[in-house]
Amino acid sequence: MNNLIEKIIWILTINFMLNACSSVAKDPPKPKNSRINKLDSLLTISEPEAKAIGKRIWINECGGTIEGLTSWNKGEYFASLGIGHFIWYHRIKRGPYEESFPSLVRYLVSKGVNVPEFIFNKHCPWETREDFVKAKNSPQMIELRNLLFSTIPLQTEFILLRLENALPKMVSAISIKNRSKVQSNFYKLTRTAKGKYAL
């Protein structure tokens, strides 16, 4: 089983590295406070890297559209937001997945981003998918999309931080003899933009 997990990780990594995305989608704007960023980790990502990687993720995950940054899939009971499909639950119905949107909001605030007041609410303001769809063109939804579009590079940083924070758990699922090698290879991949994108 451990070998299977290791093989899957390597296949996915190689696949992502080999499949470069090409698109003519408009570049997301860089945040006002952009600069070369040292993440709160062992990872470093430059502003151009964060922007380019974020654009690729945005195209792959959201179709390169601003509307694609806010979604709520049929059969689910949570909003899926941003390039990382960050989950945001309503207070009434929680789920088995880790809620990641509030953590993203805290990260954005720590980077000096002004976020709309309603986002500071601990829970998603839309109770159901139907409520969410009805609010498609509401001022709140437009404000949310604008925030998500303007922070694509910061979302990229946040995705990498979450991945690095999950590394110990991922490594614990493989054989002890391969753990240091996999961890070393993880950080080798983070030294290049293509490696960061693959991760």
Please give the residue ranges for each predicted region.
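Cell-wall polysaccharide-cleaving catalytic domain and substrate-binding groove, primarily
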Residues: 22-199
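Bacterial N-terminal signal peptides that target proteins for export
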Residues: 1-9
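Intrinsically disordered, low-complexity segments enriched in glycine/proline and serine/threonine
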Residues: 9-10, 64
